Amino acid sequence: MRAREIQRNWQHLGKRGILFLGILIICSAANNLWVTVYYGVPVWKEATTTLFCASDAKAYETEVHNVWATHACVPTDPNPQEVVLENVTENFNMWKNNMVEQMHTDIISLWDESLKPCVKLTPLCVTLTCTNVTNNRTNANKNDTNINATVTSTDEIKNCSFNITTELKDKKKRVSALFYKLDIVQIKQSEINQSESEDRLINCNTSTVTQACPKVSFEPIPIHYCAPAGFAILKCNNNTCNGTGPCTNVSTVQCTHGIKPVVSTQLLLNGSLAEEEIIIRSEDITKNTKNIIVQLNEAVEINCTRPSNNTRKSIHIGPGRAFYATGDIIGDIRQAHCNISGGQWNKTVNQVKKELGKHFNKTIIFQPSSGGDPQVTRHIFNCRGEFSYCDTTDTVDDTEEEEDTTITIPCRIKQIINMWQKVGQAIYAPPTAGNITCRSNITGMILTRDGGNDNNTRTEETFRPGGGDMRDNWRSELYKYKVVQIEPLGIAPTRARRRVVQREKRAVGIGALFLGFLGAAGSTMGAASITLTVQARQLLSGIVQQQNNLLRAIEAQQQMLQLTVWGIKQLRARVLAVERYLRDQQLLGIWGCSGKLICTTNVPWNSSWSNKSQSEIWENMTWMQWEKEISNHTSTIYRLIEESQIQQEKNEQDLLALDKWASLWNWFDISNWLWYIKIFIMIVGGLIGLRIVFTVLSVVNRVRQGYSPLSFQTLTPSPRGPDRPEGIEEGGGEQDKDRSVRLVSGFLALAWDDLRNLCLFSYRHLRDLVLIATRILDRGLKGSWEALKYLWNLILYWGQEIKNSAINLLNTTAIAVAEGTDRIIEIVYRAFRALLHIPRRIRQGFERLLL
């Protein structure tokens, strides 16, 4: 009884243990995390890509071709979308912004492109005979807003005559034109007439000059830079953003605001304004070598004019080429100038000094430029095709201007301008007929700070207007933008696991994963199938590389195809969008996630990648924070997902190979039973027919041998001998051993007897065949074994013989060598003894002679 009680307790304990073990397994399985792929996550990283332009070019004058080629840009979006990113902090750096470099390169390319079809002024590098243009007028008061001042004859313009080639290259003619004094250099003074001199164009010994086409306009048109698909532009909306550091108010846009490509120095014109206070921006404000960009919060209007009523004439300098020059000046020769409201400018300068004082805690002093290149020491800008060089000394002095006063900035016009983007290349701006007036807004300044060794002891800091690097102009507008690349593929741990075919994972040779795209061409089909993933990836890389090569070819043929830089950028942007999409879809396809936004995998999550719990990840972290945490392990996770998918595909392929055995279960389908019965009846009928045929043939054979056929109804006993009596009634005696033929009656009995005899016949013959085959196989194996034993003994015998022969040969050789060595030693010894005894033999010979 006690044994039975213990047995019952163990049974209950076993059931409870199994239940507890099952719960433990379920709980442990529930705590396992698996890698899950997400497509479309809000993750980005800093990138450098090709931007394209958008512009409302059709809204401007259509008769002229603007140098910015905005007609090749896409139209602007009438309803631009801007999405504010909540709880996002992003770092910006305007001094290391590729958008600035890209815009700088684009503007250079646009200037070059606009000048390609224009006339080269190399034939003008001849001796110019120049005289001063005389015009006796008086200068106006500085405070007069309607300036009618004129310059003296030696100030600005000279009338020059020179020889030039006509339409016929072997003919020359003398022509004259007016040149600004800044555009010519005196060669020598005339000895006869002091007012006459020999001059040349200023560029003839340094650079080539291209005349701007007369239909080209330099009027700045707003350009919107746009990011291609797969990329985005982040915008910092902090009102006090200084262009560097973290920004907490971030939004994403597809295009920037309209940026006017104004080429100017010292003063920034027609840009954007600060929303609150004046912003001071510098890469390192403690270094005096770094420029300081000042963004104003209120625009200051500046009105510039060239009051002289000039006329323009065309001078033919060869077949199909014309040079446009100033023909005459109608009326007074008055100086170009700009007017600024004194009170407004004085207020702005004081605010700038106040902001600079916050950074240096010293007295701020503004001084004029200390000298250098005219493009830096003067405020340069373009007004309706005329390039003006203005002296800004009066704008930085410390005199307090009254509210109603006007600051007049004198300007000088140059027609030959050294292009700010290239060395050894200049542009000739054709004169513009009539009066010229431009109204602009000063929205910023570019300053430089004086250096020195006594910075710590000085109580003043001196700032001067600067510029010259057009990148600073573009930075003043692009400081709040940065380009990022959207990474829509994200990975995170979840408890969901992909249901796959469970098979033992086989090792894959690591060398196969590094084969080239065509490296598996000579491998077997099975070996090449392992590298399909690598081939797909390298095929896409080849497509991308080919597209880049094609674009480089198009860019090289830009002049032939008449493509502007915007056309190239649009081609790049479109191809780049396709490449980005194909790459993402290729990765999803390799991972077995095509067409899925959320895709589970069979890769277990490794705690070394991140040991945070699932709740900490999904409830407390953003996708950007999560991506930064696992960024060092992303490539490893991608590789494991890829290997898992490859193994799954192999398992599925093996499973498909086993599907043919699944059709065996269909044999038991009731719908197939009638077909089975029909086949059975056909087989039985065939066997019966064969039996009948064989029976008829047997009867015919016996009849031919002289026997009569047996009766189908009578059983005839076999005859007995006289010495073999039948058995007695008591059952004694020997039983009869003669067989009697059993007669059957009925069709089924006959069929069953025939089938039984046929099966026995087949069994006996198959048994005999198997026995014969077994006997033959046994004899063959025994013979093979005997042959192998004989061959092995033969090998051992001949091996021993060869060994003995080698030993004998070695012994014989050793003996021969030893005997030869002994003989050689003996001969050498005897020769040595003979040589040694020569003096003795000589002495003995002398002794015999003496005796």
From Swiss-Prot:
Q: Where is this site: Cleavage?
A: 506-507
Q: Share the domain note from the entry.
A: Some of the most genetically diverse regions of the viral genome are present in Env. They are called variable regions 1 through 5 (V1 through V5). Coreceptor usage of gp120 is determined mainly by the primary structure of the third variable region (V3) in the outer domain of gp120. The sequence of V3 determines which coreceptor, CCR5 and/or CXCR4 (corresponding to R5/macrophage, X4/T cell and R5X4/T cell and macrophage tropism), is used to trigger the fusion potential of the Env complex, and hence which cells the virus can infect. Binding to CCR5 involves a region adjacent in addition to V3. The membrane proximal external region (MPER) present in gp41 is a tryptophan-rich region recognized by the antibodies 2F5, Z13, and 4E10. MPER seems to play a role in fusion.
Cited InterPro entries:
Gp120_core_sf (IPR036377), Gp160 (IPR037527), GP41-like (IPR000328), HIV1_Gp120 (IPR000777)
What span is annotated as the signal peptide, if there is one? 1-31
Q: Where is this region: Immunosuppression?
A: 569-587
* Topological domains annotated Cytoplasmic: 701-851
**Keywords (A to Z) from UniProt:** AIDS, Apoptosis, Clathrin-mediated endocytosis of virus by host, Cleavage on pair of basic residues, Coiled coil, Disulfide bond, Fusion of virus membrane with host endosomal membrane, Fusion of virus membrane with host membrane, Glycoprotein, Host cell membrane, Host endosome, Host membrane, Host-virus interaction, Lipoprotein, Membrane, Palmitate, Signal, Transmembrane, Transmembrane helix, Viral attachment to host cell, Viral envelope protein, Viral immunoevasion, Viral penetration into host cytoplasm, Virion, Virus endocytosis by host, Virus entry into host cell
Where in this protein does the record put region MPER? 657-678
Basic and acidic residues bias located where?
457-469
Q: Does the keyword Transmembrane helix apply?
A: yes
GO terms of biological process kind: clathrin-dependent endocytosis of virus by host cell; fusion of virus membrane with host endosome membrane; fusion of virus membrane with host plasma membrane; positive regulation of plasma membrane raft polarization; positive regulation of receptor clustering; viral protein processing; virion attachment to host cell
Identification of the protein by name: Envelope glycoprotein gp160
Query: Where do the record's region annotations for V4 lie?
Result: 390-411
| Annotated region described as CD4-binding loop, given as residue ranges | 369-379
Locate the region Fusion peptide.
507-527
Which residues are reported to be glycosylated?
Answer: 87, 132, 136, 143, 148, 159, 163, 193, 205, 238, 242, 249, 270, 303, 309, 339, 346, 361, 435, 441, 455, 606, 611, 620, 632
Question: Which portions of the sequence form the region V2?
Answer: 160-204
Where is motif Di-leucine internalization motif found? 850-851
Leftover remarks: Inhibitors targeting HIV-1 viral envelope proteins are used as antiretroviral drugs. Attachment of virions to the cell surface via non-specific interactions and CD4 binding can be blocked by inhibitors that include cyanovirin-N, cyclotriazadisulfonamide analogs, PRO 2000, TNX 355 and PRO 542. In addition, BMS 806 can block CD4-induced conformational changes. Env interactions with the coreceptor molecules can be targeted by CCR5 antagonists including SCH-D, maraviroc (UK 427857) and aplaviroc (GW 873140), and the CXCR4 antagonist AMD 070. HIV-1 lineages are divided in three main groups, M (for Major), O (for Outlier), and N (for New, or Non-M, Non-O). The vast majority of strains found worldwide belong to the group M. Group O seems to be endemic to and largely confined to Cameroon and neighboring countries in West Central Africa, where these viruses represent a small minority of HIV-1 strains. The group N is represented by a limited number of isolates from Cameroonian persons. The group M is further subdivided in 9 clades or subtypes (A to D, F to H, J and K).
Give positions of region: V3: 304-337
Which species is this UniProt entry from?
A: Human immunodeficiency virus type 1 group M subtype K (isolate 97ZR-EQTB11)
Q: Which family does it belong to?
A: Belongs to the HIV-1 env protein family.
Region V5, annotated ranges: 454-466, 456-466
Q: Spell out where lipidation (S-palmitoyl cysteine) occurs.
A: 759
